Amino acid sequence: MKKIRIGSRDSKLAIIQSELIMSAIRKYDPDIELELITMKTTGDKILDKTLDKIEGKGLFVKELDNALYNNEVDITVHSYKDMPLEENPELPVVALSKREDPRDAFILPQNGENGEPIGSSSLRRQLQLKELFPGCKTAPIRGNVQTRLKKLDSGEFSAIVLAAAGIKRLGLESRIGRYFSVDEILPAASQGIIAVQGRVGENFDFLKLFHSEESLCISLAERTFVREMNGGCSTPIAAYATIQGSEIILKGLYCNETTGELRKECVSGNRNNPVELGYELVKKMKSSKSI
């Protein structure tokens, strides 16, 4: 009997996302034995600093990557938006989920009181919030979803902004006060998509029922744009792609950190060329005098 060991962060959301993959594997072959192995990453342990002050998104994958290298697990599970833009060729992304809701969500405290500040450690979100609500104050917040909700409900923040996909997967949709449209707050590249990583050269047929070619297409466009604009975890760059028939529509956001000016651009092209479309949006964005 074949056995597959799945590596995951130990947060409730990460485990739920891993269970979605395990369910798809069972549908593919009920005889495959599955083992979930959870671990705490460095990014989960360091909560008193924003990601740009430590090592960025790589801190959420380092321990999981090591587990793959050391053959302690066979695949690892990630929120794709939290993975480094420069992917490791020895540990490729081997499957992507269908995209959940890509929007950001506005979460209010259970007591319903409003005030300041709004909690978000994402500069991408902070700058778009300030453009949407001039004069609003924001402050960084770290931790998993449950930790952030506790901080919100204890009165540390008047509201927090989180990815809607995670809130929905946790069954906490009732906590959402409102959704931000993608025109109000452009999401992070690959937001709402779960990624599975494995070792190069191995067989991953058992992920066929889980993998979404559409997610691969839109992620290639989004991540190419953000990577080529030099966007890391703290850089205010965002991208969102949709497929309409044979075309991809790709929207991008860039902030000039010197002037604080936000710029948005949009391009469209053949869905068979997502990487080229990402480069096209980079060229269009960089042609602006404000970049």
Curated annotation (Swiss-Prot):
Q: Which residues carry this modification: S-(dipyrrolylmethanemethyl)cysteine?
A: C233
The UniProt entry, under Pfam families, shows: Porphobil_deam (PF01379), Porphobil_deamC (PF03900)
Q: What is this protein called?
A: Porphobilinogen deaminase
Organism, scientific name: Ruminiclostridium josui
Q: Which Gene3D superfamilies match?
A: Periplasmic binding protein-like II (3.40.190.10), Porphobilinogen deaminase, C-terminal domain (3.30.160.40)
Q: Which cofactor(s) are needed, names only?
A: dipyrromethane
**Family to which this protein belongs:** Belongs to the HMBS family.
Q: Which InterPro entries match?
A: HemC, Porphobilin_deaminase_cofac_BS, Porphobilin_deaminase_N, Porphobilinogen_deaminase_C, Porphobilinogen_deaminase_C_sf
Enzyme Commission number(s) from the entry = 2.5.1.61
Protein keywords: Porphyrin biosynthesis, Transferase
Q: What does this protein do?
A: Tetrapolymerization of the monopyrrole PBG into the hydroxymethylbilane pre-uroporphyrinogen in several discrete steps.
Q: Give the misc comment.
A: The porphobilinogen subunits are added to the dipyrromethane group.
Q: Which GO terms describe its cellular component?
A: cytoplasm
